[in-house]
Amino acid sequence: MSSVNLSSFIDMLRLGCNNIAKNYEYINQLNVFPVPDGDTGTNMKVTITEAIKKLENEKSHIKSFSELGKNFTRDLLLFSRGNSGVIFSQIMKGFFSNIIVNKTSNNSELSIEDVANAFIVAQEVAYKNVSKPVEGTMLTVARLISNEFKSQKNRPKTLEKLFEQAVKVAWQAVKKTPQMLPVLKASGVVDSGAYGFACFLEGMLSYYGGESNLDDNTLSTIEIKFNKFKEQHANEDEFGYCTEYVLRLGLKINQTVEKQKFHQKKFESKVNRIANSVVIASDKDNGFVKVHAHTLKPHLLLEMGLNYGEFEFVKIDNMNLQVNNKNNSPTKRVLKPAIVATVPTEAFAERIREDHDINAILCTDDTGAPSVFSLLEAVKLTNSSNVIFLLHDKNYFLSANETIKQLKHQKINADYVITANPVESIAALTVFNSDLSIHTNVKAMKRFIKEFASATITQASKSYKENKVMVNKNDFIAVTNKSIIASESQLTDCFFKTIDILSKKVKKPEFLLAYYGKDITEQDAKKMQALVEKKYKLFCEFSPGEQKVFSYIIGIQ
Protein backbone atom coordinates (compact mmCIF):
# COMPACT_ATOMS: atom_id res chain seq x y z
CA MET A 1 0.00 0.00 0.00
CA SER A 2 1.57 3.27 -1.15
CA SER A 3 -0.96 5.67 0.43
CA VAL A 4 -3.51 5.92 3.23
CA ASN A 5 -6.88 7.68 3.30
CA LEU A 6 -8.27 9.91 6.04
CA SER A 7 -10.49 7.34 7.75
CA SER A 8 -7.72 4.75 7.86
CA PHE A 9 -5.22 7.24 9.23
CA ILE A 10 -7.63 8.24 12.01
CA ASP A 11 -7.87 4.52 12.86
CA MET A 12 -4.06 4.39 12.97
CA LEU A 13 -3.95 7.29 15.42
CA ARG A 14 -6.54 5.56 17.57
CA LEU A 15 -4.54 2.32 17.56
CA GLY A 16 -1.49 4.32 18.66
CA CYS A 17 -3.58 5.69 21.52
CA ASN A 18 -4.78 2.20 22.45
CA ASN A 19 -1.24 0.89 22.64
CA ILE A 20 -0.18 3.62 25.04
CA ALA A 21 -3.29 2.90 27.13
CA LYS A 22 -2.36 -0.79 27.27
CA ASN A 23 1.21 -0.07 28.34
CA TYR A 24 0.91 3.07 30.47
CA GLU A 25 1.34 1.28 33.81
CA TYR A 26 4.61 -0.26 32.66
CA ILE A 27 5.73 3.12 31.27
CA ASN A 28 5.01 4.65 34.70
CA GLN A 29 7.48 2.24 36.28
CA LEU A 30 10.35 3.24 33.97
CA ASN A 31 11.56 5.90 36.38
CA VAL A 32 15.10 6.75 37.41
CA PHE A 33 14.66 6.04 41.12
CA PRO A 34 14.10 2.67 42.77
CA VAL A 35 10.52 3.73 43.50
CA PRO A 36 7.88 3.23 40.75
CA ASP A 37 6.41 6.72 41.18
CA GLY A 38 6.68 7.96 37.59
CA ASP A 39 3.61 9.26 35.81
CA THR A 40 4.86 9.50 32.23
CA GLY A 41 2.56 6.70 31.14
CA THR A 42 -0.45 8.32 32.76
CA ASN A 43 0.40 11.71 31.27
CA MET A 44 0.82 10.33 27.76
CA LYS A 45 -2.31 8.21 28.07
CA VAL A 46 -4.49 11.11 29.23
CA THR A 47 -3.00 13.52 26.67
CA ILE A 48 -3.69 11.39 23.62
CA THR A 49 -6.87 9.71 24.89
CA GLU A 50 -8.58 13.06 25.46
CA ALA A 51 -7.46 14.29 22.02
CA ILE A 52 -8.69 11.08 20.34
CA LYS A 53 -12.02 11.32 22.17
CA LYS A 54 -12.42 14.86 20.82
CA LEU A 55 -11.45 13.63 17.37
CA GLU A 56 -14.07 10.87 17.51
CA ASN A 57 -16.74 13.46 18.35
CA GLU A 58 -15.67 15.69 15.45
CA LYS A 59 -14.79 12.96 12.95
CA SER A 60 -17.93 13.37 10.87
CA HIS A 61 -17.08 17.05 10.32
CA ILE A 62 -13.46 16.43 9.35
CA LYS A 63 -13.17 16.22 5.59
CA SER A 64 -9.43 16.56 4.98
CA PHE A 65 -6.05 15.77 6.46
CA SER A 66 -5.62 19.50 6.92
CA GLU A 67 -8.65 19.70 9.20
CA LEU A 68 -7.53 16.55 10.99
CA GLY A 69 -4.12 18.04 11.66
CA LYS A 70 -5.49 21.35 12.91
CA ASN A 71 -7.99 19.72 15.26
CA PHE A 72 -5.78 16.92 16.53
CA THR A 73 -2.69 19.02 17.26
CA ARG A 74 -4.81 21.71 18.89
CA ASP A 75 -6.41 19.21 21.25
CA LEU A 76 -3.12 17.46 22.00
CA LEU A 77 -1.72 20.74 23.31
CA LEU A 78 -4.86 21.66 25.26
CA PHE A 79 -5.02 18.28 26.97
CA SER A 80 -1.26 17.73 27.33
CA ARG A 81 0.00 16.78 30.77
CA GLY A 82 3.53 16.97 32.12
CA ASN A 83 6.72 17.22 30.09
CA SER A 84 5.95 14.03 28.18
CA GLY A 85 2.51 15.21 27.10
CA VAL A 86 3.69 18.65 26.01
CA ILE A 87 6.72 17.33 24.11
CA PHE A 88 4.58 14.65 22.43
CA SER A 89 2.15 17.37 21.32
CA GLN A 90 5.04 19.33 19.76
CA ILE A 91 6.29 16.27 17.87
CA MET A 92 2.80 15.74 16.45
CA LYS A 93 2.49 19.44 15.67
CA GLY A 94 5.60 19.11 13.51
CA PHE A 95 4.33 15.88 11.94
CA PHE A 96 1.14 17.59 10.74
CA SER A 97 2.59 21.03 9.88
CA ASN A 98 3.16 20.39 6.15
CA ILE A 99 0.09 18.15 5.94
CA ILE A 100 -2.09 21.02 7.21
CA VAL A 101 -0.78 23.25 4.43
CA ASN A 102 -0.72 20.74 1.56
CA LYS A 103 -3.59 18.33 2.25
CA THR A 104 -6.61 20.60 2.39
CA SER A 105 -8.82 18.89 -0.18
CA ASN A 106 -11.46 16.28 0.56
CA ASN A 107 -10.64 12.62 -0.13
CA SER A 108 -6.91 13.34 -0.21
CA GLU A 109 -4.48 10.61 0.82
CA LEU A 110 -1.06 10.56 2.42
CA SER A 111 1.70 9.11 0.28
CA ILE A 112 4.96 7.53 1.36
CA GLU A 113 6.63 10.85 0.55
CA ASP A 114 4.13 12.78 2.70
CA VAL A 115 4.64 10.55 5.74
CA ALA A 116 8.43 10.43 5.41
CA ASN A 117 8.58 14.22 5.20
CA ALA A 118 6.18 14.48 8.15
CA PHE A 119 8.60 12.48 10.31
CA ILE A 120 11.44 14.79 9.24
CA VAL A 121 9.57 17.99 10.09
CA ALA A 122 8.29 16.48 13.36
CA GLN A 123 11.82 16.48 14.74
CA GLU A 124 12.59 19.99 13.48
CA VAL A 125 9.51 21.58 15.06
CA ALA A 126 9.83 19.66 18.34
CA TYR A 127 13.47 20.63 18.87
CA LYS A 128 12.64 24.23 18.01
CA ASN A 129 9.70 24.48 20.40
CA VAL A 130 11.30 22.77 23.40
CA SER A 131 13.52 25.34 25.10
CA LYS A 132 16.13 22.89 26.37
CA PRO A 133 16.06 19.67 24.31
CA VAL A 134 17.53 16.70 26.19
CA GLU A 135 18.95 13.67 24.38
CA GLY A 136 17.97 10.28 25.67
CA THR A 137 14.27 11.17 25.59
CA MET A 138 11.43 10.89 23.07
CA LEU A 139 13.07 13.79 21.23
CA THR A 140 15.92 11.42 20.40
CA VAL A 141 13.44 8.93 18.98
CA ALA A 142 11.99 11.65 16.75
CA ARG A 143 15.47 12.77 15.67
CA LEU A 144 16.72 9.32 14.71
CA ILE A 145 13.55 8.53 12.74
CA SER A 146 13.95 11.87 10.97
CA ASN A 147 17.56 11.07 10.10
CA GLU A 148 16.49 7.68 8.76
CA PHE A 149 14.11 9.18 6.21
CA LYS A 150 16.21 12.15 5.09
CA SER A 151 17.91 9.88 2.60
CA GLN A 152 15.67 8.91 -0.33
CA LYS A 153 17.31 5.49 -0.56
CA ASN A 154 16.08 4.63 2.95
CA ARG A 155 12.44 5.16 2.04
CA PRO A 156 10.54 1.88 1.50
CA LYS A 157 8.06 1.28 -1.31
CA THR A 158 5.01 0.83 0.92
CA LEU A 159 3.61 2.66 3.95
CA GLU A 160 3.55 -0.59 5.91
CA LYS A 161 7.31 -1.00 5.41
CA LEU A 162 7.85 2.69 6.20
CA PHE A 163 6.09 2.38 9.56
CA GLU A 164 7.92 -0.90 10.21
CA GLN A 165 11.17 0.97 9.64
CA ALA A 166 10.08 3.88 11.87
CA VAL A 167 9.12 1.48 14.68
CA LYS A 168 12.40 -0.42 14.31
CA VAL A 169 14.40 2.81 14.57
CA ALA A 170 12.22 3.94 17.50
CA TRP A 171 12.94 0.82 19.56
CA GLN A 172 16.63 1.03 18.68
CA ALA A 173 16.58 4.63 19.94
CA VAL A 174 14.81 3.56 23.14
CA LYS A 175 17.55 1.01 23.81
CA LYS A 176 20.18 3.75 23.36
CA THR A 177 18.65 6.13 25.91
CA PRO A 178 20.60 4.71 28.91
CA GLN A 179 23.85 5.55 27.09
CA MET A 180 22.68 9.14 26.61
CA LEU A 181 21.40 9.77 30.15
CA PRO A 182 23.69 8.44 32.91
CA VAL A 183 20.85 8.41 35.44
CA LEU A 184 18.98 5.91 33.25
CA LYS A 185 22.05 3.70 32.97
CA ALA A 186 22.61 3.77 36.73
CA SER A 187 19.02 2.70 37.30
CA GLY A 188 19.01 0.01 34.64
CA VAL A 189 16.01 1.43 32.76
CA VAL A 190 15.23 3.10 29.44
CA ASP A 191 13.57 6.51 29.11
CA SER A 192 9.85 6.28 29.79
CA GLY A 193 8.84 9.01 27.33
CA ALA A 194 10.87 7.43 24.55
CA TYR A 195 9.28 4.07 25.35
CA GLY A 196 5.82 5.64 25.25
CA PHE A 197 6.42 7.28 21.87
CA ALA A 198 7.67 3.97 20.46
CA CYS A 199 4.50 2.30 21.78
CA PHE A 200 2.41 4.92 19.97
CA LEU A 201 4.16 4.26 16.65
CA GLU A 202 3.92 0.50 17.17
CA GLY A 203 0.19 0.91 17.70
CA MET A 204 -0.10 2.80 14.41
CA LEU A 205 1.83 0.04 12.66
CA SER A 206 -0.59 -2.59 13.99
CA TYR A 207 -3.18 -1.23 11.54
CA TYR A 208 -1.34 -3.08 8.78
CA GLY A 209 -1.38 -6.33 10.73
CA GLY A 210 -5.01 -6.97 9.87
CA GLU A 211 -6.24 -6.73 13.48
CA SER A 212 -7.80 -3.35 14.15
CA ASN A 213 -8.68 -4.17 17.79
CA LEU A 214 -10.28 -0.75 18.27
CA ASP A 215 -11.28 -1.07 21.92
CA ASP A 216 -13.79 1.54 23.02
CA ASN A 217 -12.88 0.86 26.64
CA THR A 218 -9.59 2.68 26.17
CA LEU A 219 -11.52 5.84 25.45
CA SER A 220 -13.51 5.82 28.68
CA THR A 221 -14.10 9.27 30.10
CA ILE A 222 -11.27 10.72 32.18
CA GLU A 223 -12.68 13.63 34.11
CA ILE A 224 -10.52 16.48 35.34
CA LYS A 225 -11.25 17.06 39.02
CA PHE A 226 -11.29 20.58 40.36
CA ASN A 227 -12.42 19.50 43.84
CA LYS A 228 -15.41 20.88 45.69
CA PHE A 229 -14.97 24.40 44.38
CA LYS A 230 -15.57 23.23 40.81
CA GLU A 231 -18.74 21.45 41.92
CA GLN A 232 -20.01 24.52 43.76
CA HIS A 233 -19.29 26.95 40.95
CA ALA A 234 -19.63 24.80 37.85
CA ASN A 235 -22.25 27.12 36.38
CA GLU A 236 -20.53 30.47 36.81
CA ASP A 237 -19.29 30.55 33.23
CA GLU A 238 -22.68 29.51 31.87
CA PHE A 239 -24.35 32.89 32.39
CA GLY A 240 -25.37 34.51 29.12
CA TYR A 241 -26.43 33.05 25.79
CA CYS A 242 -25.17 29.99 23.98
CA THR A 243 -25.11 31.29 20.42
CA GLU A 244 -24.62 29.15 17.34
CA TYR A 245 -24.95 29.92 13.66
CA VAL A 246 -23.91 28.83 10.21
CA LEU A 247 -22.90 31.74 8.00
CA ARG A 248 -22.89 31.50 4.18
CA LEU A 249 -20.03 33.77 3.13
CA GLY A 250 -20.73 36.43 0.51
CA LEU A 251 -24.47 35.77 0.38
CA LYS A 252 -26.58 38.97 0.30
CA ILE A 253 -30.28 39.36 1.09
CA ASN A 254 -30.03 43.11 0.66
CA GLN A 255 -28.20 43.61 -2.62
CA THR A 256 -27.26 47.19 -1.74
CA VAL A 257 -25.15 46.10 1.22
CA GLU A 258 -21.55 45.13 0.50
CA LYS A 259 -20.10 42.14 2.35
CA GLN A 260 -16.55 42.12 3.69
CA LYS A 261 -13.95 39.51 2.79
CA PHE A 262 -13.73 36.94 5.58
CA HIS A 263 -10.43 36.63 7.49
CA GLN A 264 -10.76 33.98 10.19
CA LYS A 265 -8.03 35.28 12.52
CA LYS A 266 -9.44 38.81 12.52
CA PHE A 267 -12.97 37.48 12.98
CA GLU A 268 -11.88 35.25 15.89
CA SER A 269 -10.13 38.19 17.51
CA LYS A 270 -13.34 40.25 17.39
CA VAL A 271 -15.50 37.41 18.69
CA ASN A 272 -13.15 36.70 21.58
CA ARG A 273 -13.57 40.27 22.82
CA ILE A 274 -17.24 39.72 23.62
CA ALA A 275 -17.51 35.95 24.11
CA ASN A 276 -15.92 32.85 25.58
CA SER A 277 -16.18 29.13 24.81
CA VAL A 278 -15.58 30.21 21.22
CA VAL A 279 -15.36 27.60 18.46
CA ILE A 280 -15.12 28.81 14.86
CA ALA A 281 -14.74 26.33 12.00
CA SER A 282 -14.58 27.41 8.38
CA ASP A 283 -15.00 25.45 5.17
CA LYS A 284 -13.46 27.61 2.48
CA ASP A 285 -14.30 25.14 -0.29
CA ASN A 286 -18.02 25.34 0.48
CA GLY A 287 -17.98 28.95 1.60
CA PHE A 288 -19.48 28.76 5.07
CA VAL A 289 -18.46 29.29 8.69
CA LYS A 290 -19.83 27.58 11.81
CA VAL A 291 -19.71 29.73 14.96
CA HIS A 292 -20.35 28.67 18.57
CA ALA A 293 -19.83 31.03 21.51
CA HIS A 294 -21.12 31.97 24.97
CA THR A 295 -21.80 35.68 25.27
CA LEU A 296 -23.86 38.26 27.13
CA LYS A 297 -24.34 40.16 23.85
CA PRO A 298 -25.64 37.75 21.19
CA HIS A 299 -26.90 40.64 19.05
CA LEU A 300 -23.32 41.86 18.61
CA LEU A 301 -22.21 38.36 17.63
CA LEU A 302 -24.96 38.24 14.99
CA GLU A 303 -24.05 41.70 13.70
CA MET A 304 -20.42 40.60 13.29
CA GLY A 305 -21.50 37.66 11.16
CA LEU A 306 -23.72 39.79 8.93
CA ASN A 307 -20.64 41.74 7.83
CA TYR A 308 -19.48 38.68 5.88
CA GLY A 309 -22.64 36.92 4.66
CA GLU A 310 -26.11 35.66 5.59
CA PHE A 311 -27.31 33.05 8.07
CA GLU A 312 -28.37 29.56 7.07
CA PHE A 313 -29.02 28.57 10.69
CA VAL A 314 -29.23 30.43 14.01
CA LYS A 315 -29.75 29.03 17.52
CA ILE A 316 -29.64 31.06 20.77
CA ASP A 317 -30.23 29.54 24.24
CA ASN A 318 -30.55 31.54 27.46
CA MET A 319 -28.26 29.70 29.88
CA ASN A 320 -29.42 31.79 32.85
CA LEU A 321 -32.63 29.78 32.94
CA GLN A 322 -30.61 26.69 33.81
CA VAL A 323 -28.72 28.16 36.77
CA ASN A 324 -29.24 30.36 39.80
CA ASN A 325 -30.03 33.71 38.16
CA LYS A 326 -29.56 35.96 41.16
CA ASN A 327 -26.62 37.53 39.30
CA ASN A 328 -27.52 38.88 35.87
CA SER A 329 -24.03 39.84 34.81
CA PRO A 330 -20.57 38.32 35.19
CA THR A 331 -18.44 39.46 38.09
CA LYS A 332 -15.52 41.64 37.11
CA ARG A 333 -12.13 40.08 37.69
CA VAL A 334 -10.45 41.26 40.87
CA LEU A 335 -6.94 42.70 40.91
CA LYS A 336 -5.71 40.93 44.04
CA PRO A 337 -3.44 37.97 43.21
CA ALA A 338 -4.91 34.50 43.54
CA ILE A 339 -3.38 31.04 43.83
CA VAL A 340 -3.94 28.03 41.57
CA ALA A 341 -2.36 25.07 43.37
CA THR A 342 -1.61 21.50 42.36
CA VAL A 343 -1.57 18.74 44.96
CA PRO A 344 -1.40 14.95 44.71
CA THR A 345 -4.44 14.13 46.87
CA GLU A 346 -7.70 15.47 48.23
CA ALA A 347 -6.22 15.43 51.76
CA PHE A 348 -3.68 18.10 50.80
CA ALA A 349 -6.37 20.06 48.96
CA GLU A 350 -8.61 20.06 52.02
CA ARG A 351 -5.77 21.35 54.21
CA ILE A 352 -5.09 24.23 51.83
CA ARG A 353 -8.79 25.10 51.58
CA GLU A 354 -9.18 25.20 55.36
CA ASP A 355 -5.99 27.09 56.22
CA HIS A 356 -5.70 29.50 53.30
CA ASP A 357 -9.18 29.84 51.76
CA ILE A 358 -7.85 28.75 48.37
CA ASN A 359 -10.23 26.76 46.21
CA ALA A 360 -8.68 26.59 42.73
CA ILE A 361 -6.87 23.33 43.45
CA LEU A 362 -6.11 20.50 41.03
CA CYS A 363 -5.57 16.98 42.39
CA THR A 364 -3.18 15.00 40.20
CA ASP A 365 -3.26 11.48 41.65
CA ASP A 366 -6.08 10.33 39.37
CA THR A 367 -5.70 12.58 36.33
CA GLY A 368 -1.92 12.86 36.04
CA ALA A 369 -0.10 16.16 35.56
CA PRO A 370 -2.29 19.22 34.87
CA SER A 371 -2.93 20.06 31.22
CA VAL A 372 -3.00 23.55 29.73
CA PHE A 373 -6.78 23.17 29.50
CA SER A 374 -7.18 22.24 33.18
CA LEU A 375 -4.94 25.11 34.30
CA LEU A 376 -6.92 27.59 32.18
CA GLU A 377 -10.16 26.31 33.68
CA ALA A 378 -8.73 26.64 37.19
CA VAL A 379 -7.75 30.26 36.50
CA LYS A 380 -11.40 30.99 35.67
CA LEU A 381 -12.34 29.81 39.15
CA THR A 382 -10.12 32.44 40.79
CA ASN A 383 -11.90 35.34 39.09
CA SER A 384 -8.60 37.22 39.31
CA SER A 385 -6.54 39.01 36.69
CA ASN A 386 -3.35 38.19 38.63
CA VAL A 387 -2.58 34.52 39.22
CA ILE A 388 0.25 32.51 40.77
CA PHE A 389 0.56 28.83 39.88
CA LEU A 390 1.85 26.89 42.89
CA LEU A 391 3.14 23.61 41.46
CA HIS A 392 4.28 20.70 43.64
CA ASP A 393 6.24 19.03 40.81
CA LYS A 394 8.77 20.67 38.46
CA ASN A 395 7.58 18.44 35.61
CA TYR A 396 4.50 20.66 35.43
CA PHE A 397 6.59 23.61 34.23
CA LEU A 398 5.94 23.23 30.49
CA SER A 399 2.17 23.14 30.89
CA ALA A 400 2.25 26.14 33.24
CA ASN A 401 4.52 28.08 30.91
CA GLU A 402 2.23 27.48 27.92
CA THR A 403 -0.78 28.47 30.04
CA ILE A 404 0.91 31.73 31.03
CA LYS A 405 1.46 32.52 27.33
CA GLN A 406 -2.21 31.97 26.58
CA LEU A 407 -3.32 34.03 29.58
CA LYS A 408 -1.44 37.04 28.22
CA HIS A 409 -3.95 37.18 25.36
CA GLN A 410 -6.72 37.40 27.99
CA LYS A 411 -4.85 40.23 29.75
CA ILE A 412 -4.27 38.07 32.82
CA ASN A 413 -0.89 38.34 34.54
CA ALA A 414 0.52 35.03 35.75
CA ASP A 415 3.67 33.58 37.28
CA TYR A 416 4.60 30.32 38.95
CA VAL A 417 6.35 28.88 42.00
CA ILE A 418 7.64 25.32 41.77
CA THR A 419 8.19 23.27 44.92
CA ALA A 420 9.70 19.84 45.48
CA ASN A 421 6.57 18.39 47.08
CA PRO A 422 3.16 19.42 48.49
CA VAL A 423 4.58 20.00 51.98
CA GLU A 424 6.84 22.70 50.54
CA SER A 425 3.79 24.17 48.80
CA ILE A 426 1.87 24.35 52.08
CA ALA A 427 4.88 26.01 53.72
CA ALA A 428 5.18 28.55 50.89
CA LEU A 429 1.53 29.54 51.33
CA THR A 430 2.26 30.79 54.85
CA VAL A 431 3.99 33.86 53.38
CA PHE A 432 1.46 34.54 50.61
CA ASN A 433 -0.23 37.92 51.02
CA SER A 434 -3.07 38.82 48.65
CA ASP A 435 -2.54 42.52 49.38
CA LEU A 436 0.88 42.39 47.72
CA SER A 437 1.77 42.10 44.03
CA ILE A 438 2.46 38.87 42.14
CA HIS A 439 6.15 39.75 41.89
CA THR A 440 6.50 40.40 45.63
CA ASN A 441 4.63 37.22 46.54
CA VAL A 442 6.58 34.99 44.17
CA LYS A 443 9.86 36.41 45.45
CA ALA A 444 8.83 35.89 49.10
CA MET A 445 7.58 32.34 48.50
CA LYS A 446 10.75 31.30 46.67
CA ARG A 447 12.91 32.80 49.42
CA PHE A 448 10.93 30.92 52.08
CA ILE A 449 11.29 27.62 50.21
CA LYS A 450 15.08 28.02 50.23
CA GLU A 451 14.98 28.23 54.03
CA PHE A 452 12.72 25.19 54.31
CA ALA A 453 14.09 21.62 54.27
CA SER A 454 11.96 18.71 53.11
CA ALA A 455 12.20 15.09 51.99
CA THR A 456 10.07 12.13 50.95
CA ILE A 457 10.37 8.70 52.55
CA THR A 458 9.37 5.53 50.75
CA GLN A 459 10.38 1.93 50.24
CA ALA A 460 12.81 0.90 47.50
CA SER A 461 11.50 -1.60 44.96
CA LYS A 462 15.01 -2.66 43.91
CA SER A 463 18.64 -2.46 44.97
CA TYR A 464 20.39 0.71 43.94
CA LYS A 465 23.57 2.69 44.52
CA GLU A 466 23.82 6.45 44.32
CA ASN A 467 27.02 8.26 45.22
CA LYS A 468 27.95 6.85 48.65
CA VAL A 469 24.48 5.60 49.54
CA MET A 470 23.82 1.89 49.06
CA VAL A 471 20.16 0.91 48.83
CA ASN A 472 18.91 -2.62 49.27
CA LYS A 473 15.56 -3.79 47.99
CA ASN A 474 12.77 -2.99 50.51
CA ASP A 475 14.95 -0.47 52.37
CA PHE A 476 13.27 2.73 53.48
CA ILE A 477 14.90 5.64 51.67
CA ALA A 478 14.70 9.41 52.01
CA VAL A 479 14.95 11.57 48.91
CA THR A 480 15.48 15.32 48.61
CA ASN A 481 16.20 17.23 45.40
CA LYS A 482 16.18 13.89 43.55
CA SER A 483 19.09 12.62 45.67
CA ILE A 484 18.93 9.76 48.15
CA ILE A 485 20.12 11.05 51.54
CA ALA A 486 19.28 8.08 53.76
CA SER A 487 18.65 4.35 53.46
CA GLU A 488 17.70 2.13 56.40
CA SER A 489 16.02 -1.23 56.83
CA GLN A 490 13.67 0.20 59.49
CA LEU A 491 11.26 3.09 58.87
CA THR A 492 11.92 4.72 62.25
CA ASP A 493 15.69 4.72 61.69
CA CYS A 494 15.23 6.26 58.25
CA PHE A 495 12.89 8.91 59.67
CA PHE A 496 15.40 9.86 62.40
CA LYS A 497 18.33 9.99 59.99
CA THR A 498 16.32 12.19 57.66
CA ILE A 499 15.56 14.62 60.49
CA ASP A 500 19.26 14.74 61.39
CA ILE A 501 20.21 15.64 57.82
CA LEU A 502 17.41 18.16 57.24
CA SER A 503 18.01 19.88 60.59
CA LYS A 504 21.53 20.79 59.48
CA LYS A 505 20.05 22.75 56.56
CA VAL A 506 17.76 24.88 58.75
CA LYS A 507 18.78 27.59 61.21
CA LYS A 508 17.36 26.76 64.63
CA PRO A 509 14.86 24.06 63.59
CA GLU A 510 11.70 24.28 65.68
CA PHE A 511 8.81 22.80 63.71
CA LEU A 512 8.31 19.51 61.86
CA LEU A 513 5.41 18.97 59.47
CA ALA A 514 4.72 15.41 58.34
CA TYR A 515 2.08 13.94 56.03
CA TYR A 516 1.72 10.17 56.13
CA GLY A 517 0.69 8.03 53.19
CA LYS A 518 -1.88 5.31 52.63
CA ASP A 519 0.52 2.62 53.88
CA ILE A 520 0.73 4.24 57.34
CA THR A 521 -2.10 3.86 59.86
CA GLU A 522 -3.15 6.72 62.12
CA GLN A 523 -1.96 4.72 65.13
CA ASP A 524 1.50 4.19 63.60
CA ALA A 525 1.73 7.89 62.74
CA LYS A 526 0.93 8.84 66.35
CA LYS A 527 3.65 6.48 67.61
CA MET A 528 6.16 8.04 65.22
CA GLN A 529 5.15 11.54 66.32
CA ALA A 530 5.67 10.63 69.99
CA LEU A 531 9.13 9.19 69.26
CA VAL A 532 10.17 12.28 67.28
CA GLU A 533 8.93 14.74 69.90
CA LYS A 534 10.76 12.84 72.65
CA LYS A 535 14.05 12.58 70.77
CA TYR A 536 14.23 15.98 69.07
CA LYS A 537 12.12 18.35 71.20
CA LEU A 538 10.48 19.68 68.05
CA PHE A 539 6.92 20.88 67.76
CA CYS A 540 5.40 18.25 65.45
CA GLU A 541 2.28 18.10 63.36
CA PHE A 542 1.38 14.78 61.71
CA SER A 543 -1.52 14.72 59.22
CA PRO A 544 -2.92 12.18 56.75
CA GLY A 545 -1.74 12.92 53.21
CA GLU A 546 -3.26 9.83 51.59
CA GLN A 547 -0.43 9.79 49.04
CA LYS A 548 0.08 6.44 47.31
CA VAL A 549 3.86 6.21 46.93
CA PHE A 550 5.46 7.96 49.89
CA SER A 551 5.15 6.70 53.46
CA TYR A 552 5.96 10.20 54.69
CA ILE A 553 6.53 13.63 53.22
CA ILE A 554 8.22 15.77 55.87
CA GLY A 555 9.41 19.34 56.21
CA ILE A 556 11.42 21.19 58.85
CA GLN A 557 11.61 24.90 59.56
From Swiss-Prot:
| Superkingdom per UniProt | Bacteria
Annotated SMART domains: Dak1_2 (SM01121), Dak2 (SM01120)
Any one biological process term the GO annotation gives? glycerol metabolic process
One GO MF term on file is: glycerone kinase activity
Q: Where would I find the DhaL domain in this sequence?
A: 7-206
Write down the InterPro entries for this protein, in alphabetical order.
Answer: DegV_domain_contain, DhaL_dom, DhaL_dom_sf, FakA-like_C, FakA-like_M, YloV-like
Q: Which SUPFAM superfamilies match?
A: DhaL-like
Which Pfam families has this protein been placed in?
Answer: Dak2, FakA-like_C, FakA-like_M
Q: What is this protein called?
A: Uncharacterized protein MG369
Higher taxonomy = Bacteria, Bacillati, Mycoplasmatota, Mycoplasmoidales, Mycoplasmoidaceae
